């Protein structure tokens, strides 16, 4: 997904993800509206979920509760 403004969201499944710990990503495109990326560790355990195009894929109430970073 490309564009000047990409709205992203990240949901941690694991309480703390160390740099380099996510070694496998499974990317799912969603009808040209965005992507959902699952991050896994070396043992295949799910660490977190990244959503690109979050404004298109998440409910406004979910975005409103999100912690803003960056």
Language model segments and positions:
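A short, structured beta-strand/loop element
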Residues: 7-52
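Short amphipathic beta-strand and strand-loop transition segments with alternating hydrophobic
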Residues: 1-2
